[in-house]
From Swiss-Prot:
<feature type="topological domain" description="Cytoplasmic">
    <location>
        <begin position="1"/>
        <end position="17"/>
    </location>
</feature>
<keyword id="KW-0325">Glycoprotein</keyword>
<feature type="region of interest" description="Disordered">
    <location>
        <begin position="47"/>
        <end position="71"/>
    </location>
</feature>
<dbReference type="InterPro" id="IPR056793">
    <property type="entry name" value="HSNSD_N"/>
</dbReference>
<dbReference type="GO" id="GO:0030210">
    <property type="term" value="P:heparin proteoglycan biosynthetic process"/>
</dbReference>
<keyword id="KW-0333">Golgi apparatus</keyword>
<protein>
    <recommendedName>
        <fullName>Bifunctional heparan sulfate N-deacetylase/N-sulfotransferase 1</fullName>
        <ecNumber>3.5.1.-</ecNumber>
        <ecNumber>2.8.2.8</ecNumber>
    </recommendedName>
</protein>
<dbReference type="Pfam" id="PF00685">
    <property type="entry name" value="Sulfotransfer_1"/>
</dbReference>
<keyword id="KW-1133">Transmembrane helix</keyword>
<dbReference type="GO" id="GO:0000139">
    <property type="term" value="C:Golgi membrane"/>
</dbReference>
<dbReference type="InterPro" id="IPR021930">
    <property type="entry name" value="Heparan_SO4_deacetylase_dom"/>
</dbReference>
<feature type="glycosylation site" description="N-linked (GlcNAc...) asparagine">
    <location>
        <position position="663"/>
    </location>
</feature>
<feature type="binding site">
    <location>
        <begin position="610"/>
        <end position="614"/>
    </location>
    <ligand>
        <name>adenosine 3',5'-bisphosphate</name>
    </ligand>
</feature>
<dbReference type="GO" id="GO:0102140">
    <property type="term" value="F:heparan sulfate N-deacetylase activity"/>
</dbReference>
<feature type="binding site">
    <location>
        <position position="813"/>
    </location>
    <ligand>
        <name>adenosine 3',5'-bisphosphate</name>
    </ligand>
</feature>
<feature type="transmembrane region" description="Helical; Signal-anchor for type II membrane protein">
    <location>
        <begin position="18"/>
        <end position="38"/>
    </location>
</feature>
<dbReference type="InterPro" id="IPR037359">
    <property type="entry name" value="NST/OST"/>
</dbReference>
Amino acid sequence: MSLSLKTRRFGRPVRPQLVLLLLFALCLLSVFISAYYLYGWKRGLEPSGSEAQSPDCDEPKISPSRLLPMKPLKPVDSSRTDPLVLVFVESLYSQLGQEIVAILESSRFKYRTEIAPGKGDMPTLTDKDRGRFALIVYENILKYVNLDAWNRELLDKYCVEYGVGIIGFFKANENSLLSAQLKGFPLYLHSNLGLKDCSINPKSPLLYITRPNQVEKGDLPGEDWTVFQSNHSTYEPVLLAKTKSAESIPHLSVDAALHTTVVQDLGLHDGIQRVLFGNNLNFWLHKLVFVDAVSFLTGKRLSLPLNRYVLVDIDDIFVGKEGTRMKVEDVKALYDTQMELRTHIPNFTFNLGFSGKFFHTGTDAEDEGDDLLLSYVKQFWWFPHMWSHMQPHLFHNQSVLAEQMALNRKFAVEHGIPTDMGYAVAPHHSGVYPVHVQLYEAWKQIWGIKVTSTEEYPHLKPARYRRGFVHNGIMVLPRQTCGLFTHTIFYNEYPGGPVELDKIINGGELFLTVLLNPISIFMTHLSNYGNDRLGLYTFKHLVQFLNTWTNLKLETLPPVQLAHKYFQIFPEEKDPLWQDPCEDKRHKDIWSKEKTCDRFPKLLIIGPQKTGTTALYLFLGMHSDLSSNYPSSETFEEIQFFNGQNYHKGIDWFMEFFPIPSNTTSDFYFEKSANYFDSELAPRRVAALLPKAKIITILINPADRAYSWYQHQRAHDDPVAMKYTFQEVITAGPEAPQRLRALQNRCLVPGWYSTHIERWMNHFHANQILVLDGKLLRTEPANVMETVQKFLGVTNAMDYHKTLAFDPKKGFWCQLLDGGRTKCLGKSKGRKYPDMDSDSRSFLMDYYRDHNIELSKLLYKMGQTLPTWLREELQSTR
């Protein structure tokens, strides 16, 4: 009875007032939850209370750090990680993220950017037993603090296990809490502050390049600074500053005179070392400390040595209109400044580039300056500019170019100017890159030049991408600008005012150039050393600033020695990467007008070998709108430019294989080199020179291709192929003779179709690549050629059903000529040879199974039809 009564009471209708009360409570709860997630920037920050105790402070008075129990650190084993930086950015276009990447790129450190995950997947951090990253950088440290529990534990375990550190930035905004604790850390943040007078903690263990002796007087940029405070001994100040106002910071337990703006976490709290910045990289000292932080947290694996080599070129000596040239006092100041700079840079010597034609073409006072300069000839280094300051790419005749150089050399000999420095610079860097062959030959003929420099390789901007290369025996070094140009001759008239020049020198672009490059060749001009002598002002103040704020050791070397040093540091840069000169307006302006990019091919047949590429080459050549390359005396119809030593002959050599285009827009050049397909170098090289090219590859059963290559080698009496059976070749083990392994590789490796196509897809869009079925090309060529024409977008479609005929004697399709005759490929094509033995076919079917499966996935991803042979192979493996 009582149970029944309770049940009835429970089932009674709920009063409306109670329902409304419950709804109101739920609404309030939802508002709080929405606010929590809407203002997610506050997550990870907890309001600071009064529980912070007053610690003892050393002089100078700074934010506190009290010794607490230490957690033992796992020794860092940097050999277990790859030298790669993982950078978590807010977006691909965020300013701070781009600045972080710019410093890494300038330092030539490898990196990978990822959008910082909130609840998304963390990138794969390990590969087997190796860590994939040596350092983690967060553009917004709150993205790290607020990681979901799974990813946070994953990342922290990785950092502890592999000794990987974290760099993070905290950028306050108008909604930031003025004082808060970083969630999960014994660290307090005080935000939206205006600061001044930044100093460096000399006891900071991460300092390497940074010299801690000075105070950067004045206001720090912005009013949104964050300072750090902690009682834990794991936190060590790196940079400190004062507040602009005399008022104390609310909630700060100690009235500290200096506040920490960059803090180093020694890893005593949780075993992970970190460096946290209380602002972005707009402040120049942050850039310097960031470089040191990268070095420290990677055990100096990602670090440049302290040595910096500097060479200052002065172009246009004797060139310049009246009023812009050096007078006697200017020449004396040049020499005196050189001697002054030698106290900081041993044997520092200005490098003077002269054009003899303009000697004594100034005012009387300037002509006296010319004479005094020549009286100091042994005090400076010298290099030839052009006699008449003409741009070399305008000279199409090498002998005329050589005559100009000979005049400059004659002038040098007459005035005692050294002629054996081995270095030259072309006016406006013309002819250096893009390469003007006549310039390189004339330089070697007249001057014996071994080194030059340019600001144009691979492009002028961004400057951090400039590189060196070697061509035709001449080493080409990257050249840097320094904020001075021919028209910047007066301090007060500097663009943007004198403050802009000082900003470039003192922590700005010029300072960063030296900081991030082990070797810097600076371009200046004669006019920068007359009048207000901005050249002298700039480099005196630059050296002073570097010596004040850094531990860098400034050195210099003559150009040839400097070039050898450069390629000793960067040997991978010796090989050039030729680019399309018409893709960069500056390049086109200093490229011979007799040359045209229309001479480049628009289609490449890349192979692989023994799949029908020569047949396709013949069929394409039948089309009236398509023109193939001229044959090579060494490699017949193939140029083989992008995959081997021919590449170093330059693009002029490459273009000579193609006709000079007519005025019609229908000219369509193509080339076929079947060994491009599996070349590791070719895809990148092709993409650089021919970024819009169409790519065709032909695939047959890789087992048949391997067997065909073996038979091809036997037909050419290859001793290894004659000695070993096909079965012995493809099954040879690691201990087999080297020449046998080489033949095995040429048989098997090109058949890794998916691997090679993916390499091409790293540089070309899928719609630029056409994969043809080699079996159909052999049996139904007319239909295949319809597909090819659509892919190429030719306007005058050709009906190959009417122009191809099957030749029963040859066993394949040939060109149909007038009178019913046919034109077929040579005797070397379509050879008959014994069928492959069953054991070899079985071995190869198993060998290529996974490769073929990956190929099917890749072709599906590319939107391409699976070849008939591939469908058959996949069905047989089920």
